[in-house]
Regions:
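Residues that define the transmembrane beta-barrel architecture of outer-membrane proteins
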Residues: 38-42, 74-76, 110-114, 150-156, ...
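Membrane-embedded beta-strands of outer-membrane beta-barrel proteins
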Residues: 46, 79-80, 116-118, 158-160, ...
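Outer-membrane beta-barrel "beta-signal"
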Residues: 115-118, 213-217, 251-265
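Outer-membrane beta-barrel transmembrane domain signature
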Residues: 133-240, 263-265
């Protein structure tokens, strides 16, 4: 990936941060119901990296996520990631994630995530820059209302990351990531008489600062802090008539503390 392409993507990312995160499309005359919330969350992950070939590796990881100020278990994730780096400046990634998500006090629901990514890499001085474009498909293992929740739900994730190389065991990094919906449900006037319509908008901005600590050639840890600015649009319909009763905009600011451990074979 050339330096000009990386710079263009940086400009696009900055523009999107300014104009795309807070805007809401005018969709109908139905009232807009807005809500906002904040939360403290934590993530703990252990991973095993297995080299398959010179430029190919497989990573198996298990992760726990908490929410509600660390008081509730939110998700349990099992992931298998295949990483292929045929060239110095370009790599590819495929991933499957089994998600067990808590809904309510005792109800757990299953989701399947499928990720495909292209990663461009560029070194500038002591900084290693990378631009990752990832498409994610989320398949829910339960029945959904297509006017409210598409299944699968598709998003595009754009991440710009900078790692700082130095002679110590610590390798600090920062990154910004945008989530863009590709098939979010759009509000329709009547769910009984109108076809399903799709919309796309930026529904999350993620900012992260952290550092990887190399323990030895086989063991490493990662410590990070992230802040998520989430915004999701939705719609409510009258159960009897199917008429659009309101549009919803939910905003959540989540502060996330994470600790990862990885063992390399």
């Amino acid at each position: 990936m050339s330096k000009n392409i990386v710079l263009k993507r940086i400009v696009v990312l900055c523009v999107a941060l300014v104009v795309g995160v807070f805007g809401v499309k005018a969709q109908s005359s139905a009232p807009l119901v807005e809500s906002s919330d904040s939360d403290l969350q934590a993530r703990f992950r252990v991973a095993l990296e297995i080299p398959l070939a010179e430029k190919l590796k497989l990573t198996w990881s298990e992760q726990l996520r908490t929410k509600e100020s660390f008081s509730q278990l939110d998700k349990m994730l099992t992931a298998f990631t295949l990483d292929y780096s045929p060239w110095r400046h370009l790599g590819f990634e495929g991933e499957y994630v089994f998600v067990n998500e808590r809904k309510g006090d005792e109800l757990w629901k299953v989701k399947h995530r499928f990720n495909l990514a292209v990663i461009g890499k560029l070194s500038v001085g002591r900084f290693d820059l990378s631009l990752r474009e990832r498409v994610r498909w989320v398949v829910r293992g339960y029945e959904t209302d297509e006017y409210v929740t598409p299944n699968p739900f598709t998003t595009l994730r754009t991440r710009l990351k900078a790692d700082y190389r130095n002679d110590s065991r610590w390798k600090p990094y920062v990154y910004a990531e945008l989530y863009t919906t590709l098939n979010a449900p759009a509000a329709v006037e009547n769910r009984f008489s109108c076809d399903v319509e799709r919309d796309n908008y930026i529904n999350r901005l993620r900012l992260c600062v952290g550092s990887t600590m190399k323990i030895n050639s086989h063991n490493s840890m990662d410590f990070y802090y992230m802040v998520h600015f989430n915004r999701s649009q939705g719609a409510s319909y009258d159960e009897l008539t199917g008429n659009l009763s309101s549009r919803t905009l939910k905003k959540v600011c989540a502060h996330v503390i994470g600790i990862d451990y990885k063992f390399k074979l």
